[in-house]
């Protein structure tokens, strides 16, 4: 009876024995993804520039290990992969989640430094992590999840964040490129496009009840999303349930992008 119960529990925990790396995993969507992967048996490495936020996340996520990292620095990205392999011996899952959101400005108001910083973090940073992770994922037939945005799918009236939208659109195309490039090696690459989710990044848009009601009404399902809902989508892509899924772009946005 105990043996059967143990096997049943292990079956429910879809990621037992897996090593996952979640960039930007100390808060928001990244934290929710790291937490749900851990709850399903994975050992999760999380990265953040902020060491204090990493400590707080480690305290809340079972079987997690935090590493400080500036995604704009190649040497720090390499250090994350080196530490992960040295400590755990392999890598099964990479979640490219780290990102920044610029101030809302029209194109003529954006200076080149702002533009470059957004692309360096949101796009080139994902390239850096994926490039360093691929040799390890080749050994495990692992998977990659890119966290894009529905802002990468279409333009929104009044949403003047061109660099952000450009970086997220490019990540969608890269998902398909990488899925084709590494399909023969059984590495699956998929993408999630969240809508407006209740995180620190979206708080500037949700300053009062009027803002919240407006944003809720922008989504056909009548509300903004919760980080855990993106986490559940990520869990699907990392599990064997998605063993025949690669190059997919999943919108988790309450219907916002179909308007």
Where are these regions (language model features)?
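Alpha-helical segment proximal to the catalytic Tyr-Lys
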Residues: 135, 176, 180-184, 243
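Short C-terminal tail/terminal secondary-structure segment
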Residues: 5-8, 16, 101-104, 235, ...
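Residue(s) in the substrate-gating loop at a strand-loop-helix junction
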Residues: 149
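Substrate-binding pocket helix/loop in short-chain dehydrogenase/reductase
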Residues: 105-107, 111-119, 215
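C-terminal helical subdomain
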Residues: 191, 213-241, 245, 254
């Amino acid at each position: 009876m105990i043996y059967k119960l143990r096997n049943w529990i292990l079956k429910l925990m879809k990621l037992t024995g897996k090593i996952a790396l979640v960039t930007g995993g100390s808060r928001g969507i990244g934290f929710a993804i790291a937490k749900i992967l851990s709850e399903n048996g994975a050992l999760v490495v999380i990265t953040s520039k902020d060491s204090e936020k990493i400590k707080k996340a480690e305290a809340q996520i079972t079987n997690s290990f935090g590493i400080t990292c500036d995604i704009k620095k190649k040497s720090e990205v390499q250090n994350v992969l080196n530490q992960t392999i040295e400590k755990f011996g392999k890598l099964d899952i990479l979640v490219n989640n780290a990102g920044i959101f610029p101030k809302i400005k029209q194109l003529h108001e954006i200076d080149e430094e702002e533009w470059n910083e957004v692309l360096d973090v949101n796009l080139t940073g994902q390239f850096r992590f994926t490039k360093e992770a691929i040799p390890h994922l080749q050994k495990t037939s692992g998977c990659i999840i890119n966290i894009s945005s529905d802002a990468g799918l279409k333009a929104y009236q009044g949403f003047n964040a061109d660099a952000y939208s450009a970086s997220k659109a490019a990540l969608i195309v890269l998902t398909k490129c990488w899925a084709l490039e590494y399909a023969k090696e059984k590495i699956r690459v998929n993408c999630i496009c969240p809508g407006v989710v209740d995180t620190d990044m979206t708080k500037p848009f949700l300053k009062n009840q009027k803002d919240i009601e407006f944003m809720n009404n922008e989504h056909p399902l009548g509300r903004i999303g919760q980080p855990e809902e993106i986490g559940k989508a990520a869990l699907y892509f990392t599990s064997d349930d998605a063993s025949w899924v690669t190059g997919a772009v999943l919108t988790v946005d309450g219907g916002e992008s179909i308007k």
